[in-house]
Amino acid sequence: LQNTLSLASTWTQSSDTNRSSYKGKVVDLSNRDEIKTVVREVNEFFDGNLHALINNAFATPHTWKDGKGMEDDLSSDEIMDQWDLKIAVGLTAPFLLSRLCVPMLKRKDEKSSAGCIINISSTRAKQAEDNHEAYSAAKGGILGLTQASAISLGHRHNIRVNAIIPGWINVENENKEADEASTKWEDGMTEQDHSWHPAGRVGKVEDIYKAVKFLVESDFITGEEVVVDGGVTRKMYYPE
């Protein structure tokens, strides 16, 4: 988070950007009061006009801590506490943010256009891995939220709502240490990792950026799920 804030600060200080266009803020998305506070700040910063809300956060790790399963430690609240946090950040926060941002996203007059909401889901909403119950539930819930809010907010305010479903996107090198070491995004990937994808490579962050940009600019698309996974979910698998 601090690295992201530092990068945002660098962008605002460069000669080719508008200083008022960027702002970074650390927010605890499990805390509803913090969410409400930051939305008020965003409203003031952008003068009540928001083009796009992108819901992307999740409480890592995606699995239960210490390699545990959902059926372990039944006498303890540890698993349930993790569940509550992951669902709060991964599903409740996007719903609350969407609600609170409607006044900024909706059309202000006949000459203006409404903004849009883009929810980042995951192929894990449809394909499971061991011990991903909370992650899969949150990402599956995001798809339901997208469909329902696209209809509600579309009819009432012309706000478009879509979801992006990423597959394997390599983010291991998207951090401060990798930036300082000039690490390439694909470092650590094997040829087998890449060839497993019909598209010929593992996904990178820019692939999601391009999908987001496409949906922001496409004003006749709403309620849709855009899969960005290099074709993996279309493959048939057989036991070896």
Residue ranges and their predicted role:
Residues 201-228, 233, 239:
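C-terminal substrate-recognition "lid" of short-chain dehydrogenase/reductases
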Residues 128-136, 148:
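Active-site loop-to-helix junction immediately N-terminal to the catalytic Tyr of the SDR YXXXK motif
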